[in-house]
From Swiss-Prot:
Protein name, as recorded: DNA-directed RNA polymerase subunit Rpo2C
Binding of Zn(2+), residues: C547, C550, C565, C568
Job of this protein: DNA-dependent RNA polymerase (RNAP) catalyzes the transcription of DNA into RNA using the four ribonucleoside triphosphates as substrates. The Rpo2 subunit (Rpo2N and Rpo2C in this organism) is implicated in DNA promoter recognition and in nucleotide binding.
Keywords, comma-separated and alphabetical: Cytoplasm, DNA-binding, DNA-directed RNA polymerase, Metal-binding, Nucleotidyltransferase, Transcription, Transferase, Zinc
Gene: rpo2C
Pfam families: RNA_pol_Rpb2_4, RNA_pol_Rpb2_5, RNA_pol_Rpb2_6, RNA_pol_Rpb2_7
Enzyme class: transferase
Reactions catalysed: RNA(n) + a ribonucleoside 5'-triphosphate = RNA(n+1) + diphosphate
Location in the cell: Cytoplasm
Natural source organism: Methanococcus vannielii (strain ATCC 35089 / DSM 1224 / JCM 13029 / OCM 148 / SB)
Length: 611
């Protein structure tokens, strides 16, 4: 007796079938005729003899053209009607011309890439091979020539690139934003870019790129960049940051007020900080501001009711709650808006702009996951030049190409070179872009070698370089990881309330973490004094009295000028340090002792004289 196939719906066994193949076939016919949801998945596993039907959400599905008897159901007649907007995509799905398959059902499908590759064995054909890529990977040219991790990285970094993010950026008040000054459309384009409208909002610029070493300054993915190109506006962008505050209402009819705080107000800053404020407390347009400057002057009533009763709400007891420029930032006031909240309170918003010219440490990336930072800015006259006098904008390291297998970038550079010579844009769409040899022959027609390599001369000595240099045009993106937003140092600053260690992070004027691995290096070197300085003296030093008899933390009675042990009762005058001596420990260690005590563990310290 033939074994019956189990039928599962969303993983739950509901029935069995004697003829599973016919059941699956009839269900698919019903789906294509619109009787079942187009998002239903119907798959048959011959090995386990199971039918799996999925109708639940969260499954990734993709559209494919149905093939019947060796012919695509998407005929030229239908295509023409779609192009003329007579038919919609939804109509093709409803009539079974196109159907959605998930990963499970795709195991039962034989999918052809192109119509002319269809055989009688095929069940589906791709709408177009380029649909396998999403938005991020689709804008990269020749991705089929790159390794998969680089495509993933390129897709991720494309989201971080600077350009013109939206049409109304002139009046937007986003918390932070970037604007590239001279975005260009890429010379090597893809069909994805046309579909997305990328050319209307480009996010990068075409760089003349040379692949060569330059005095070691482009090691480890660093770039050498042309100073004259930067002065002409290459990679130049503006960073925007918005600040806001509103006049809050308090119980008892009190409220905040936008104004220039008077000197008697609690928390008054230096007079210099208020220098750009108008009488209404709002800053003047085009004022230059730096870290700590007030841009929205505001005062608030006292925080506690007792203060009001004692002072009878005198003006001097109001608090300064002004908004200041963030630590480590500066710029020019770009936009000031005075509006109202939903509750009718006055709302002030200020946008500050800061010009960001590319500098050491700024991050750039091609569309092939080749990311790096600027390692050296070189005057144009010192850079190598070609026989035609072309000086590259960017010099990248030859070691960046072979191990990463980003041949797509090599093809893009040749394509960009051809496009600039022929004053046209080259198609680099996946699987259907202009071929390698077509581009090579085009270069030869213009007198260049088909490899893209050129003879170059040293800008400093004028001597001919011994080997030919690969030169081309590549589209590079400036990423929002700019060194001006990350550079940070601290000598002294605020500490945390709980641990008394320096705060963390650039925004809080924090210290630089000296971690376990850094500690191990000093231990290995035997640098004991340096260890003590980093981990104790410059972090959270704390002096406490410890009972020499029982090892408990002692108590200091300030009024009586005595110290005593709460456990064994030992005591002595403040001048004596024999029974209860002062011990220097890290405050974090003292905190640990206190937390152990809170859990019922009583740690004791054993003391001995210094050697």
């Amino acid at each position: 007796m033939e074994k019956q196939a189990n039928v599962y719906v969303n993983g739950k066994l509901i029935d069995t079938s004697k003829d599973p193949e016919n059941l699956v076939k009839s269900l698919r016919i019903q789906r294509r005729s619109g009787k079942l949801s187009p998002n239903t998945s119907i798959s048959f596993n011959e090995e386990s003899n199971d039918i799996h039907i999925s109708t639940d959400g969260g499954r990734a599905v993709r559209p494919l053209v149905v093939v019947e008897n060796g012919f695509s159901k998407l005929t030229n007649e239908l295509l023409e009607k779609v192009n003329n907007n007579e038919l919609t995509f939804e109509y093709l799905v409803k009539t079974g011309v196109i159907e959605f398959l998930d990963a499970e059902e795709e195991e039962n499908a034989r999918i052809a890439m192109y119509n002319d590759e269809i055989t009688f064995e095929n069940t589906h054909v791709e709408i177009d091979p380029l649909v396998i890529l999403g938005i991020g990977a689709g804008v990269a040219p020749y991705p089929e020539h790159n390794s998969a991790p680089r495509i993933t990285m390129a897709a991720a970094m494309g989201k971080q690139s600077l350009g013109i993010p939206m049409a109304n950026i002139k009046w937007r008040m986003d918390t932070r934003g970037h604007l590239l000054h001279y975005p260009q459309v890429p010379l090597v384009r893809t069909k994805h870019q046309e579909i997305l409208g990328f050319d209307k909002r480009p996010a990068g610029q075409n760089f003349v790129v040379a692949v060569m070493s330059y005095e070691g300054y482009n090691m480890e993915d660093a770039f050498v960049i042309n100073k004259a190109s930067l002065e002409r506006g290459l990679g130049r962008s503006t960073f925007f940051r918005s600040y806001e505050s509103f006049e809050k209402r308090y119980p008892g009819g009190q409220l905040d007020k936008f104004e220039v705080p008077e000197k008697g107000v609690r928390g008054y800053r230096a007079e210099e900080a208020y220098r750009n404020l108008g009488d209404d407390g709002l800053i003047d347009l085009e004022s230059e501001v730096r870290s700590g400057d007030v841009i929205l002057g505001k005062t608030s009533p006292p925080r506690f009711l007792e203060e009001q009763e004692i002072t009878l709400q005198t003006k001097s007891q109001r608090r300064d709650t002004s908004v200041t420029i963030r630590h480590g930032e500066e710029g020019v006031v770009d936009l000031v808006i005075l509006s109202e909240t939903k509750e009718g309170n006055r709302l002030g918003k200020v946008r500050v702009r800061d010009l960001r010219v590319p500098e050491f440490g700024d991050k750039f990336a091609s569309r092939h996951g080749q990311k790096g930072v600027i390692g050296l800015v070189v005057p144009q006259e010192d850079l190598p030049f070609t026989e035609d006098g072309v000086i590259p904008d960017l010099i990248i390291n030859p070691h960046a190409i072979p191990s990463r297998m980003t041949i797509g970038q090599v093809l893009e550079m040749i394509g960009g070179k051809v496009g600039s010579l022929e004053c046209r844009r080259v198609d680099g769409t996946i699987f259907s872009g202009e071929g390698e040899w077509a581009l090579r022959h085009a270069l030869e027609n213009y007198g260049f070698t088909h490899s893209g390599k050129e003879t170059m001369y040293d800008g400093k000595t004028g001597r001919k370089l011994e080997c030919e240099i690969f030169v081309g045009v590549a589209y590079y993106q400036k990423l929002h990881h700019l060194v001006a937003g990350k550079i940070h140092a601290r000598s002294r600053g605020p500490i945390q309330v709980l641990t008394r260690q320096p705060t963390e992070g650039r925004a809080r004027e924090g210290g630089l973490r000296f971690g376990e691995m850094e500690r191990d290096v000093l231990v290995a070197h035997g640098a004991a004094l340096l260890l003590k300085e980093r981990l104790l003296d410059e972090s959270d030093p704390h002096e406490d009295y410890v009972c020499a008899k029982c090892g408990e933390i002692a108590i200091f009675d300030y009024k009586r000028g005595m110290k005593f042990c709460p456990v064994c009762g030992e005591s002595e005058d403040i001048q004596d340090n024999r029974k209860i001596p002062p011990v220097k420990i890290a405050y974090a260690f003292k905190l640990l002792l206190d937390e152990l005590k809170s859990m019922g563990i009583d740690p004791k310290l054993k003391l001995k004289d210094r050697a």
